[in-house]
Amino acid sequence: MAYNKESKQRRFLFAIDLDGTLLADSANGTVHPKTEEAIKKAVAQGHIVSIITGRPWRSTLPVYEKLGLNAIVGNYNGAHIHNPADPFFIPAITYLDLNEVLYILGDEKVKKEITNYAIEGPDWVQLMHRDPNLERVFGFNQATKFRECINLEKIPLKPTGIVFDVKPDTDVLELLTYLKRRYGDLGEFSSWSKGEGLSPVFDITSIGIDKGKVISLIMRYYNIDIDDTVAMGDSYNDLSMYNVANVCVSPANAEPLIKKMSTVVMKQTNKEGAVGYFIDHS
């Protein structure tokens, strides 16, 4: 169905996180059949289904195409907002100050928790050392310019984001809280799952960037009423969406804090098609 701003049909906006929510398996990028069926049906009915994720576009593209999506996408938690299906939509890219990021990463409390990190822009990546799990989620090897090892002399001064892995025993919430309190004037910090049994990933984006702001833009662009907005997520980087959307849905595998903030907590996990079951019964 073609998008029509003047349409009188009641349409919903489903703003959906990828890892731990829409995807049944982050490593393989698989989608539960129930979720795939429900999303395709919603799109065919004219509803807006938007992916808002910490991933870059290169590792979001296969999912976007598989589901037949046609709406705005938010990558890097909103640092890159674009619509691959609309050549007339002007993309928005927000960059980080590299010097400020390196200052944050040099903090002893932060540095001792980091096991690997990557600095990246829309078409380039520098990764400290190879890691198949991290590379599968972020599609680093698909970047136009990929470099193993961080060469500070050859990094553009304006990356879009930084991602870093932490130790398996890192207290995620404690570190996230520390980053926000200590460096909240320099950037936005979030943490999310990159797959079952794997350590969480942290990311840093420019100040003022979060998923909730992407929802605000999307609802205005498509003329969606606030009452008809639904956010679906499982981790800490999804909380900003919950502050904007009218209905907040989490799968059974979501972090306890996310469940506490949710309007609806599904019985199913992401692996069991939680997103599909909710949309199908909306």
UniProtKB/Swiss-Prot annotation:
Q: What is this protein called?
A: Putative phosphatase in upp 3'region
Q: Name one GO cellular component term.
A: cytosol
Q: Any stretches that span the bilayer, and where are they?
A: none
Annotated EC:
3.1.3.-
Report whether Membrane shows up as a keyword of the record. no
Which parts of the sequence bind phosphate? 18, 53-54, 211, 237
> What is a single molecular function from GO for this protein?
magnesium ion binding
Q: Do you know which SUPFAM superfamilies this protein is assigned to?
A: HAD-like (SSF56784)
User: Which sites are catalytic?
Assistant: 17
